[in-house]
């Protein structure tokens, strides 16, 4: 089975398994922000996707980085 086939996801939920270092950083960010761990992940993922909408296109990355006044204000 090829992993390069892109299929639509059946839903809008994601399960993440984090390594200890990443989890520790996320817990620290959660404490500093006062958000739940889930909301902290959501804010950070949205921000990343807005900053880097086309991760494999360097021109889009530069444009996205200029437009990042950002999602954190929206929440």
UniProtKB/Swiss-Prot annotation:
GO terms for molecular function: DNA binding. Keywords: Activator, Conjugation, Cytoplasm, DNA-binding, Plasmid, Transcription, Transcription regulation. InterPro entries: TraY. Pfam families: TraY. One of its GO terms (cellular component) is cytoplasm. It is found in: Cytoplasm. Belongs to the TraY family. Part of the relaxosome, a complex composed of plasmid encoded TraI, TraM, TraY and host-encoded IHF bound to the F plasmid origin of transfer (oriT). Interacts with TraM, probably through its C-terminus. Conjugative DNA transfer (CDT) is the unidirectional transfer of ssDNA plasmid from a donor to a recipient cell. It is the central mechanism by which antibiotic resistance and virulence factors are propagated in bacterial populations. Part of the relaxosome, which facilitates a site- and strand-specific cut in the origin of transfer by TraI, at the nic site. Relaxosome formation requires binding of IHF and TraY to the oriT region, which then facilitates binding of TraI. Also positively regulates tra gene expression. This is Relaxosome protein TraY. It comes from Escherichia coli.
């Amino acid at each position: 089975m090829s992993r390069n086939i892109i299929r639509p996801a059946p839903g809008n939920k994601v399960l993440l398994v984090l390594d200890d270092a990443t989890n520790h950083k996320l817990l620290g960010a959660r404490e500093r922000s006062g958000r739940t761990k889930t909301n902290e992940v959501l804010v950070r993922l949205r921000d990343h996707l807005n900053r880097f909408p086309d991760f494999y296109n360097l021109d889009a990355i530069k444009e996205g980085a200029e437009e990042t006044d950002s999602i954190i204000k929206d929440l």
